């Protein structure tokens, strides 16, 4: 007999393990722990560990001042980002994500490599009267509009058109 120890990553809020005498649901309490499975027959061992890759907002400690009021989007172990080519905003600085947004996983291809992108709606600020060359100016708020945006896995960025990339997004808290 052999003890097989499988690590359940900290991001795994739920899942299922089956095989070698184990058959149980995993919960958030299992995240960041090891599962100990006693394997009696190594020749016929078949263990399946399925982890649910839920989409989540991740925030940094407030001591990381550059990210206060912002969040990154993660799915399982993957961090997602946005590139200029995937939005209608004139700059990624104008994008806000809705805390209650619904993300839709879609199959996507970059440079012949298939991956799962996330599609959602973004809030974009109307800055038509904004002087991007002025260091200071009066605040002129003309509202926000919702538009389609695609997020791709961070590992895949910078393989298409030249432009901006962003991981941390300000959050548009709506009531």
Where do the language-model regions lie?
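Surface-exposed, short loops/turns at beta-strand junctions within beta-sandwich domains
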Residues: 41-43
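Short strand-coil-strand connectors
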Residues: 9, 20-22, 74-76
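Short, glycine- and charge-enriched coil/turn segments that flank and shape catalytic ligand pockets
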Residues: 1, 21-25, 113, 117
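C-terminal beta-rich recognition modules with glycine/proline-rich loops and embedded aromatic residues
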Residues: 50-175
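Proline-anchored loop/turn motifs at beta-strand termini and strand-loop-strand connectors
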Residues: 9-12, 52
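Solvent-exposed beta-strand/loop surfaces of large extracellular or lumenal domains
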Residues: 12-38, 57-63
């Amino acid at each position: 007999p052999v003890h097989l120890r499988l690590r359940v990553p900290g991001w795994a809020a739920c899942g299922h393990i089956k095989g070698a005498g184990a058959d149980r649901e995993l919960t958030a309490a299992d995240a960041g722990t090891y599962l100990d499975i006693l394997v009696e027959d190594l020749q016929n061992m078949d263990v399946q560990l399925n982890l649910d890759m839920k989409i989540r907002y991740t925030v940094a400690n407030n001591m990381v001042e550059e990210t206060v009021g912002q969040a990154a989007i993660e799915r399982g172990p993957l961090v997602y980002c946005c590139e200029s080519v995937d939005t209608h905003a004139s700059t990624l600085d104008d994008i806000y994500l809705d805390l209650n947004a619904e993300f839709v996983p879609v199959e996507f291809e970059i440079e012949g490599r298939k991956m799962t992108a996330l599609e959602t709606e973004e809030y974009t600020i109307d800055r038509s009267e904004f002087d991007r060359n002025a260091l200071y100016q009066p605040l002129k708020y003309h509202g926000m509009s919702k538009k389609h945006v695609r997020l791709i896995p961070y590992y895949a960025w910078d393989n298409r058109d030249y432009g901006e990339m962003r991981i941390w997004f300000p959050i548009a808290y709506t009531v």
